[in-house]
Amino acid sequence: MLIGVGTDIVQIPRIEKILHLYPELFAKKILTSKELKQFALLGKINHAAFLAKRFAAKEAVSKAFGVGIGQGINFKDITILNNDLGKPIVEVSSNYTNTLSPFNIHLSLADDYPVCVAFAVIESSYNVILG
């Protein structure tokens, strides 16, 4: 059963400006500890695109849940990792999911400077209704 669909588009130059003003603060605000480890391994030239994709992905996932960031789910509740082939894998904190039935999140990310886009689909094998 389809729970929800969400999408988000982010202008990478917007993230570049934020990084220029707040080089460490912004990453720490939106990334989980697992994501910060990946971020630290990147060269600075890739920081803005990485953060833009994570920002867009988390917004898309929250929209697919039907709530949006800051409306019941936060940036730190969602972790975006990649499998060995580069496919994005979404982990959602038990703080948010403990009342939900099992679900799968499908996420697609793309970037072509100056924009990146994220598209998320959440499905469940159970009949559930979210707020």
Swiss-Prot record:
Gene Ontology terms: biological process: fatty acid biosynthetic process
Subcellular location: Cytoplasm
Catalytic activity: apo-[ACP] + CoA = holo-[ACP] + adenosine 3',5'-bisphosphate + H(+)
Keywords in alphabetical order: Cytoplasm, Fatty acid biosynthesis, Fatty acid metabolism, Lipid biosynthesis, Lipid metabolism, Magnesium, Metal-binding, Transferase
EC nos: 2.7.8.7
Gene3D superfamilies (UniProt xref): 4'-phosphopantetheinyl transferase domain
Cofactor(s) required, per the database record: Mg(2+)
Keyword Nuclease carried by entry: no
Family statement: Belongs to the P-Pant transferase superfamily. AcpS family.
Name of the protein in question: Holo-[acyl-carrier-protein] synthase
Organism this protein belongs to: Rickettsia conorii (strain ATCC VR-613 / Malish 7)
Gene symbol of the encoding locus: acpS
